[in-house]
Curated annotation (Swiss-Prot):
The keyword Cytoplasm applies. The lineage of its organism: Archaea, Methanobacteriati, Methanobacteriota, Thermococci, Thermococcales. Insensitive to pentalenolactone, an inhibitor of bacterial and eukaryotic GAPDH. Activity in vitro is significantly stabilized by potassium citrate. It comes from the Archaea. This is Glyceraldehyde-3-phosphate dehydrogenase. InterPro entries: DapB_N, GlycerAld/Erythrose_P_DH, GlycerAld_3-P_DH_AS, GlycerAld_3-P_DH_cat, GlycerAld_3-P_DH_NAD(P)-bd, Glyceraldehyde-3-P_DH_2_arc, NAD(P)-bd_dom_sf. Belongs to the glyceraldehyde-3-phosphate dehydrogenase family.
Length: 334
């Protein structure tokens, strides 16, 4: 029997999760919600995806456009086993009462506070913690990126300091910036470090800057080691870590632009780069300090986590069975 999945919010994350659900043989996409009949809503309908209004207050927008919806979010909740909340940050907490009333499990995204869910989740780090849970939060794109690589070396970690160089907006976002400035997060630590600690118990401090780019985040990471680790050890660990890929400047990967072009060359949907990209040349060990630089595709790295979280919540697969299944279905390289 397939798990019936609904998506509340069919935007950057929602449409990617919806696509990923359709690639699973143990899940069924029942429908998605929209607040207005925009091009994404029309595209969903063209793909045969049932579209629902996010609430009754949005119905007039669809009626005015002659766009026929299947009902509202409440109607969708009656048909699903789980809802993936991909609404803007803060909305998930407000929506939770609807999910509770409907008796439906829910997955929230990283824009929500950790308290909204029973567990914060990154599949390879704490899959077991989500087993049987009703409410799970998939952490943000940046936090997912940090956890993927730091979890792989956590037995060696004494203290982490990471600088987050964040993209200003997603490619289709015309409302955010800056477009001609570098904007620091003047509160130290930034929220990313404490967010990592909701998944793995390590000592970490982070600072963050927003820069005028749309395609990826970059992290510069320094790790103080509590036991010896060589550069070759780290390379070997990362090469054997799922959803982490090593890229070399020598082979033309000089910036995030080439990383996204690589995803395009793979013919990935929306040029998704689900894997965290680590520059091999940046991996260096000086004394008891490890340095490396990684890039995160903010639109897609959390997508496989949503799929794995669904399986964990319904306890239909063990950790590595789910991860391997998700990886294969999405064409994740390792």
């Amino acid at each position: 029997m397939k798990i019936k999945v609904g998506i509340n919010g069919y935007g950057t994350i929602g449409k990617r999760v919806a696509y990923a659900v359709t690639k699973q043989d143990d899940m069924e996409l029942i429908g998605v919600t929209k607040t207005k009949p925009d091009f994404e809503a029309y595209r969903a309908k063209e793909l045969g995806i049932p579209v629902y209004a996010a609430s009754e207050e949005f119905l007039p927008r669809f009626e005015k456009a002659g766009f026929e919806v299947e009902g509202t979010l409440n109607d969708l909740l009656e048909k699903v086993d789980i809802i993936v909340d991909a609404t803007p940050g803060g909305m998930g907490e407000k929506n939770k009462q609807l999910y509770e009333k409907a008796g439906v499990k829910a997955i929230f995204q990283g824009g929500e506070k950790a308290e909204v869910a029973q567990v914060s989740f990154v599949a390879q780090a704490n899959y077991e913690a989500a087993l049987g849970k009703d409410y799970v939060r998939v952490v943000s794109c940046n936090t997912t990126g940090l956890v993927r690589t730091l979890n792989a070396i956590k037995d060696y970690v004494d203290y982490v300091y990471a600088v987050m160089i964040r993209r200003a907006a997603d490619p289709n976002d015309i409302k955010r910036g800056p477009i001609n400035a570098i904007k620091p997060s003047v509160t130290i630590p930034s929220h990313h470090g404490p967010d990592v600690q909701t998944v793995i118990p390590i000592n970490i401090e982070t600072s963050a800057f927003v820069v005028p780019t749309t395609i990826m985040h970059v992290h510069s990471i320094m790790v103080e080691l509590k036991k010896p680790l060589t550069r070759e050890d780290v390379i070997d660990i990362f090469e054997n870590t799922t959803r982490v890929l090593l890229f070399e400047k020598e082979k033309g990967f000089e910036s995030t632009a080439q990383l996204i072009e690589f995803a395009r060359d793979l013919h990935r949907e929306w040029n998704n780069l689900y894997e965290i990209a680590v520059w091999k040349e940046s991996i260096n060990v000086k004394g008891n300090r490890l340095f490396y630089i990684q890039a995160v595709h903010q639109e897609s790295d959390v997508i496989p986590e949503n799929i794995d979280a669904i399986r964990a919540m319904f306890e239909i697969a063990e950790k590595w069975e789910s991860i391997k299944k998700t990886n294969k279905s999405l064409g994740i390289l390792k």
